[in-house]
């Protein structure tokens, strides 16, 4: 089968369009003929040599796939050959065929295209898990979402509008993305390059602060994030693009009863991910099937041009997701 392999760690030029052996499903696994996968920030970090896959997972890049079941391993009961599915995988998505655990896979309605489906698992599950399950965001509260225009942020905005329609949504974004972020349903869009988002949050909320923050920047934003949190607010930390070390005023955090929760999806235990996916499928997949929530595809590339897709990701001008299309689909 065709797949993207790495000649070495480094830039996009290390990605090669190669022929490798098609995997065989083991117990509890399904083999998916992949129609589409998407590019995620962890793929870039793994390509650079800084984010190895969990033990036992494929070293091929790609954390989510959409396609059709080709075959099933022993013990699989839900899916059979020919079923449309979308799956969260620990690796192996940048290939014509990918293995997925059956309980990490979800049924894919005919109303959802494979290109859209390829955008679901990594970003929508991440947004839903951290905002609603861990962050405990409730209706009529306030939320600050960083990185407007990125896959997780656009997913988070849509989920807030669908699941907590009375929630006030604040989003940070670059100048060129402000109008498009607003069109997704954000009530307030803050130009982080021109404004202090902490000052803007205090102004917008009349100095109260927000109840939940979804942040992938980390150290660079920590002080401003804590200043932006309301009493008993929660900072959901899902990335460290802006650094891993920062000072924290613990006294203020204690007095204001604030929480910081660090969270990643990929390294969670298999059974825990299966539970999260089952809850997500019940809560969110019907909304996507109905068109209430719509994955945003900014650009598509043939699998052979994965290096160009990574270059686009690293330049940061995309809005929504970048999708790779498999050959002969």
Name each model-derived stretch:
Residues 78, 84-148:
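NAD(P)H dinucleotide-binding glycine-rich loop of Rossmann-like/cofactor-binding domains
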Residues 148, 217, 240:
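NAD(P)H cofactor-binding loop motif with strongest signal on the N-terminal glycine-rich segment
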Residues 197-207:
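Short amphipathic alpha-helix with an adjacent loop that forms part of the alpha/beta core around
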Residues 84, 142, 168, 234, ...:
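Short glycine-centered segments of the SAM/dcSAM-binding site in methyltransferase folds
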Residues 290-299, 307-329:
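C-terminal capping/lid region of NAD(P)-dependent oxidoreductase domains
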Residues 21-38, 50-92:
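Glycine-rich beta-strand-centered segment in the early N-terminal region that forms part
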Residues 118-194:
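Mid-domain Rossmann-like dinucleotide-binding core that forms the NAD(H)/NADP(H) cofactor-binding site
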Residues 176, 182, 220-292, 325-329:
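Glycine-rich phosphate-binding loop and adjacent beta-alpha segment
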């Amino acid at each position: 089968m065709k797949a993207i392999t790495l000649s070495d760690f480094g830039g996009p030029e290390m990605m090669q369009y190669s022929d490798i052996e098609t995997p065989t499903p083991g117990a509890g696994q399904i083999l998916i003929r992949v129609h589409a996968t998407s590019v995620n920030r962890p793929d870039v970090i793994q390509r650079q040599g800084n984010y190895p896959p969990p033990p036992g997972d494929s070293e091929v890049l790609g954390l989510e796939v959409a396609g059709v079941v080709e075959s099933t391993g022993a013990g699989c009961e839900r899916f059979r050959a020919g079923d449309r599915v979308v799956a969260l995988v620990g690796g192996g998505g940048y290939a014509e065929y990918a293995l997925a655990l059956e309980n990490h896979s979800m049924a894919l309605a005919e109303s959802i295209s494979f290109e859209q489906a390829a955008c679901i698992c990594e970003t929508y599950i991440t947004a839903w898990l951290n905002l609603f399950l861990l962050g405990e965001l409730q209706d009529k509260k306030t939320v600050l979402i960083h990185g407007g225009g990125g896959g997780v942020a656009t997913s988070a905005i849509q989920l807030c509008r669908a699941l907590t329609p009375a929630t006030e949504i604040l989003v940070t974004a670059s100048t060129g993305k402000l109008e498009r972020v607003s069109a997704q349903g954000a009530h307030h869009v803050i130009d982080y390059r021109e404004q202090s988002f902490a000052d803007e949050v205090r102004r917008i909320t009349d100095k109260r602060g927000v109840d939940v923050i979804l942040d992938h920047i980390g150290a660079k934003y920590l002080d401003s994030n804590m200043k932006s949190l309301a009493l008993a607010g929660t900072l959901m930390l899902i990335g460290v693009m802006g650094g891993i070390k920062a000072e924290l005023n613990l006294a203020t955090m204690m007095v204001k009863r604030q929480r910081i929760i660090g969270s990643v999806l990929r390294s969670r235990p298999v059974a825990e991910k299966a539970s999260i996916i089952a809850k997500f499928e019940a809560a969110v997949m019907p909304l996507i099937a109905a068109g209430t929530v719509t994955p945003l595809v900014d650009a598509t590339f043939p699998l052979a041009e994965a290096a160009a897709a990574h270059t686009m990701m690293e330049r940061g001008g995309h809005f929504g997701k970048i999708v790779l299309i498999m050959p002969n689909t």
